[in-house]
Amino acid sequence: MGGWSAKPRKGMGTNLSVPNPLGFFPDHQLDPAFGANSNNPDWDFNPNKDHWPEANQVGVGAFGPGFTPPHGGLLGWSSQAQGTLHTVPAVPPPASTNRQTGRQPTPISPPLRDSHPQAMQWNSTAFQQALQDPRVRGLFFPAGGSSSGTVNPAPNIASHISSISSRTGDPALNMENITSGFLGPLLVLQAGFFLLTRILTIPQSLDSWWTSLNFLGGSPVCLGQNSQSPTSNHSPTSCPPICPGYRWMCLRRFIIFLFILLLCLIFLLVLLDYQGMLPVCPLIPGSTTTSTGPCKTCTTPAQGNSMFPSCCCTKPTDGNCTCIPIPSSWAFAKYLWEWASVRFSWLSLLVPFVQWFVGLSPTVWLSVIWMMWYWGPSLYNILSPFIPLLPIFFCLWVYI
């Protein structure tokens, strides 16, 4: 096997009836260790070499005309495998003579008592009595099986597979429902976080506006930096804790927070009163604005039971009531004033001032117009901190 030889080699390569499973190296011509069936071991002068361009030619294979390399395929070196076309006889071969004509009927199955005599004892009384023993029952029935009546049939394969699936994992959930279930809270959380960050800037903006009133025409500078605890130059709205002006900054922020809460409370009460959910019924006895008779402006009769009273009545009589035809907002304002006057008696001292202020309403309006004209360029900066509250007020107005 080790050397080159010009003499034809006898052995595995010379037996052309043995098929070459690979079909690429017929007769081991490309293997330099073999020179079988070669008059000249040199590949360039080997007349039996495999010409690869001829492999693209169409020849007759083992399964009819088709692509068959000239050196043969899985069937070896037969003439048909090498591409030689053989004439197939038109007459089919004769039928086999060792078969009977037609199909024979299926023989009748023997009775169960003959084919499976051991199965007949399952329905016997002795067998059922023996099953009462837990040790015997465990040999025939799995855990949780039933032994009443006849023996249980074979378990359902489909149900068994489904039970395995239920133990290994639940089926895939609807991704659309999962996405909508997660995106909704995430969007609400993002919107709430955005509104929260904007609302937290309201005290700082109002504090800046408040301190700017003390430094008209100049930049506000904290006065506490020249005290015994010197600090770097900073604004009075961002005092460090060691600055003496820090406590005044916290006091201003606290007053601003109370003002914002009062504003939200007033808006909520106005909204509830607008929807008739507050029993606001100001009583003005002896006033000429009252009218006795059928309540045309009331939505609920006097003797009716309503969860949200919206009728302002003084003396209900036979379905009639004394109605005060005033706007609900004025009724709400009077309700707040009466509520505050009871709890804060010093507010009664402001009544003459309020009456005088109302009497000077044209002057007041002119003053307001003048202030708006003066603060017009910076009006947006003053009102911009309250813009995040508008969506909250709108949601309360719609959903309450």
Swiss-Prot record:
Region Pre-S1: start-end pairs: 2-119
Location in the cell: Virion membrane
Stretch list, region Disordered: 1-20
Chief site of localization: virion
Post-translational modification: Isoform M is N-terminally acetylated by host at a ratio of 90%, and N-glycosylated by host at the pre-S2 region. Myristoylated.
Keyword set, alphabetical order: Acetylation, Caveolin-mediated endocytosis of virus by host, Fusion of virus membrane with host endosomal membrane, Fusion of virus membrane with host membrane, Glycoprotein, Host-virus interaction, Lipoprotein, Membrane, Myristate, Transmembrane, Transmembrane helix, Viral attachment to host cell, Viral envelope protein, Viral penetration into host cytoplasm, Virion, Virus endocytosis by host, Virus entry into host cell
InterPro entries, per the entry: HBV_HBSAG
Role played: The large envelope protein exists in two topological conformations, one which is termed 'external' or Le-HBsAg and the other 'internal' or Li-HBsAg. In its external conformation the protein attaches the virus to cell receptors and thereby initiating infection. This interaction determines the species specificity and liver tropism. This attachment induces virion internalization predominantly through caveolin-mediated endocytosis. The large envelope protein also assures fusion between virion membrane and endosomal membrane. The middle envelope protein plays an important role in the budding of the virion. It is involved in the induction of budding in a nucleocapsid independent way. In this process the majority of envelope proteins bud to form subviral lipoprotein particles of 22 nm of diameter that do not contain a nucleocapsid.
HAMAP family attached to this UniProt entry: HBV_HBSAG
Name recorded for this polypeptide: Large envelope protein
Species for this entry: Hepatitis B virus genotype A1 subtype adw2 (isolate Southern-Africa/Cai)
Lineage: Viruses, Riboviria, Pararnavirae, Artverviricota, Revtraviricetes
Name of the coding gene: S
